[in-house]
Each structure stands twice: as C-alpha cells, then as structure tokens.
C-alpha cells in the first residue's frame, strides 16, 4: 500500500503491516528518509495508508475494527479509532474530511462512524440506509460531498435529511443519491 502527501513530493509505503517508509519522490532511489515500525492489533493486517489533505496526519486502516491515526512526518501514534464493526475481516475504507478535522469510516453494520482528528473522540454515527457493509468512503476535495458505498452508492451533502427536490432523487440502497447532514 502506498499514498502520496497532498503536495505530491512525499510518498508513504506500508510494508507487511509492520512499518511505514517515507520517500521523497525527488530522491526515492536513495531509499526512505524515514522508517516507522508499529504493531497495531494482533490478528489485524493493514489494508490502507492515507495522508490527510493538510499533510499533517496519516491513517492506517486494517481488516479489523481499528483505524490508527499517526503524525505524518514524525510517525508518532496519535489515536486508535475504534467502536465500529468489522466482524467479517474485510477491507473497510476510511477517509479524512477535506478540512482534515474528522475521519469517517464505513462499517459492517451499514453505518458510517465519525471521529475528531484532534482528540480521537467518536462524534457521530450516520445511518444511510446501506443494507450491506459500507466498504468505501471518499470525499470530494473541493465540494461538500461525501460518497459511501456497499453494493449501492450514497452521496451525502450538508443540509440535513433526505431530500426529493426536483429532479426527484431516489434514496439508497437503490441506485441514486442520499442526502444527509454530515
């Protein structure tokens, strides 16, 4: 697994669920400029690594019910985010919000779970009519839109509630758009 920082100058490589190596793209052939070693949870494998859009944080997702938030360039563990379900041992996506203030994760219970990145405290659970495990969560980096998916796609926008403004929108889990306050 690998991820570029928002500037596109540094990339992180997660190796064998044990270490993260940071490389500078201008001199990656010289090897990593920093390596961090971790153990997350026994029985969990890492499934993803991501930088926050402000470049200050990284997250490690797992096939367990744990997301780890790290300081991006010192490698210091900040928070372990838990409280969501992954009782199937599958890859569940988590994403930073565009302002880097929150992490949102899917869950095998069909819900989305939200945590603050400054405290690690869970601040909300969103129910969006997903009938299967929510395995993907992504944010539009410029507009206030979040997408979540199981076998169907839900689009979330600020404003609260399910809307059926013209043109009519169907709600999830049928193909369509779900609007919910984020």
Label every model-predicted segment.
Residues 7, 16-40, 69-79, 114-124, ...:
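Per-blade loop-tip surfaces of WD-repeat and WD-like beta-propellers in eukaryotic adaptors/scaffolds
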Residues 14-17, 61-64, 106-109, 149-151:
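Conserved strand-to-loop turn within each blade of WD40 beta-propeller repeats
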Residues 6-7, 53-54, 98-99, 141-142:
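Residue-level detector of Asp-centered blade-edge/turn motifs that repeat once per structural unit
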Residues 79-103:
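A surface-exposed beta-alpha-beta supersecondary segment
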Residues 1-4, 42-50, 88-95, 132-138:
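Canonical WD40 repeat/beta-propeller blade segments in eukaryotic WD-repeat proteins
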Residues 91-92, 121-182:
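Terminal intrinsically disordered, low-complexity extensions flanking WD-repeat/beta-propeller proteins
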Residues 104-111, 117, 135:
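C-terminal transmembrane module of eukaryotic multi-pass membrane proteins
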């Amino acid at each position: 697994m690998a991820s570029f920082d928002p500037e596109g100058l540094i990339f992180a490589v997660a190796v064998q669920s044990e270490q993260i190596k940071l490389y500078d793209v201008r001199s990656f052939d010289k090897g990593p400029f920093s390596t961090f070693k971790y153990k997350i949870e026994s029985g969990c494998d890492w499934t993803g690594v991501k930088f926050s859009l402000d470049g200050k944080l990284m997250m490690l997702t797992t096939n367990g019910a744990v997301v780890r938030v790290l300081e991006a360039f010192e490698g210091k563990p900040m928070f372990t985010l838990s409280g969501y379900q992954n009782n199937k041992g599958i890859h569940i996506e988590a994403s930073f919000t565009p302002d880097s203030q929150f992490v949102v994760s899917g869950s095998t219970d069909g819900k989305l779970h939200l945590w603050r990145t400054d405290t690690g405290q869970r601040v909300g659970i969103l129910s969006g009519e997903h009938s299967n495990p929510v395995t993907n969560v992504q944010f539009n980096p410029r507009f206030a839109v979040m997408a979540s998916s199981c076998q169907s796609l839900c689009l979330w926008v600020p404003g609260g509630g399910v809307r059926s403004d013209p043109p009519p929108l169907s709600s999830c889990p049928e193909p369509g758009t779900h609007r919910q306050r984020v």
